[in-house]
Amino acid sequence: MITIKKGLDLPIAGKPEQVIRDGNAVTEVAMLGEEYVGMRPSMKVREGDTVKKGQVLFEDKKNPGVVFTAPASGTVTAINRGAKRVLQSVVIRVGGNEQVTFEKYDVAALNQLTGEQVRRNLQASGLWTALRTRPFSKVPAIDAVPSSIFVNAMDSNPLAADPAVIINEYAEDFTNGLTVLTRLHDKVNLVKSAGSNITAVGAVKVHEFGGKHPAGLVGTHIHFIDPVSLTKTVWHLNYQDVIAIGKLFTTGELFVERVVSLAGPQVKNPRLVRTVSGANLTQLTENELNAGENRVISGSVLYGAKAEGPHNYLGRYALQVSVLAEDTEKEFFGWISPQANKFSITRTVLGHFGKKLFNFTTAENGGHRAMVPIGSYERVMPLDILPTLLLRDLEVGDTDSAQSLGCLELDEEDLALCTFVDPGKADYGSFLRQALDKIEKEG
């Protein structure tokens, strides 16, 4: 077992009850285009078209053969685009039960599948997009071969669901999905929390991690088990997509159900809810939130997307819906007050004393300023890198130095804690993405 000692378990109120219940019914779902790094869509549908579940909505021009399929049957009501015609979302009003079917196999035959059969079914169904590369966090090319595949069956994010609860609900499908992945590649790593009751198949290598967040991030697992470089790539996916793969290969149908944590200080009854991928989050959270102005987040409070407008939907890779109170009020002389109800990693407020949970809000508690290297980054970065030097290089755009310091191993979520503890309020995730895009383009 690998124990992570540096990091931070955010003491946030609103932790979910680890019991699965049905969420609100939704009548609208969407595919979010900006979730897919570097993707350029070739649209296969128009507004007003009727689509089946599993029907192709668009294909990646840069990565021919990678298709993105509808999570529900119904009518395409909007194709939203942003600046420079970037695809924001394809919105579907749910209606009917028609669906596209794919190849299916007996459970006993899964262990005899060829790699080509697995690729063909994943790509036709759109489940190929469950896989992402490291470095660069892109959907892999249809003929690419990784060094290994990582299945992340743990989650240390604040307010996260316990993966074991969900996996045990779909135990057979999870096992079948793992079997399929072993036919795609002979090196499959399953990572779970220490002592977690999750069963793997024989050909899968099991690893256990424990300790503070980011112990549950796949970037942490890759760093310690099979580090990547510019010439070495691994793939990863989450445990719910493994369940979906198991369902696909045994039923021939696209499985889009998601169990997400609906939690946070502003949620009346924090719990695990059953919904669908791409669900409209206004509908999912209706009558679930405390009064006042709230921010609904698709994903973790540390690294998630604000759900509003064209992005008001559950993300493809999101396993959480987090809700915080919007806080736009400026606190008069807040820096000099005792702040008994505020949290700080630097122990400069009274809120540090005693173990209690905090009602975090969207307030940044300060303005943007220059980097202040006081050791905060080192306290929350468990990877074998020099965080202050790396973050400095990312902020000034020195990609050569950033690459030598290990930025290729990282994704935006891996720097979320550094952003959280930064006195200068910089968004290091966006700096990292700019650097990765430049490195991929220029080498």
Curated annotation (Swiss-Prot):
One GO process term, biological-process aspect: sodium ion transport
Record-listed E.C. numbers: 7.2.1.1
One annotated GO molecular function: oxidoreductase activity, acting on NAD(P)H, quinone or similar compound as acceptor
Keywords: Ion transport, NAD, Sodium, Sodium transport, Translocase, Transport, Ubiquinone
Entry-linked Pfam families: NQRA_2nd (PF24836), NQRA_N (PF05896), NQRA_SLBB (PF11973)
Keyword Endoplasmic reticulum: no
Reaction catalysis annotation: a ubiquinone + n Na(+)(in) + NADH + H(+) = a ubiquinol + n Na(+)(out) + NAD(+)
Domain of life: Bacteria
Family to which the UniProt record says this protein belongs: Belongs to the NqrA family.
UniProt cross-references to PANTHER family, sorted A to Z: NA(+)-TRANSLOCATING NADH-QUINONE REDUCTASE SUBUNIT A
Subunit and partners: Composed of six subunits; NqrA, NqrB, NqrC, NqrD, NqrE and NqrF.
NCBIfam families: nqrA (TIGR01936), PRK05352.1-2 (NF003759)
Job description of the protein: NQR complex catalyzes the reduction of ubiquinone-1 to ubiquinol by two successive reactions, coupled with the transport of Na(+) ions from the cytoplasm to the periplasm. NqrA to NqrE are probably involved in the second step, the conversion of ubisemiquinone to ubiquinol.
Name of protein: Na(+)-translocating NADH-quinone reductase subunit A
Native source organism of the sequence: Actinobacillus succinogenes (strain ATCC 55618 / DSM 22257 / CCUG 43843 / 130Z)
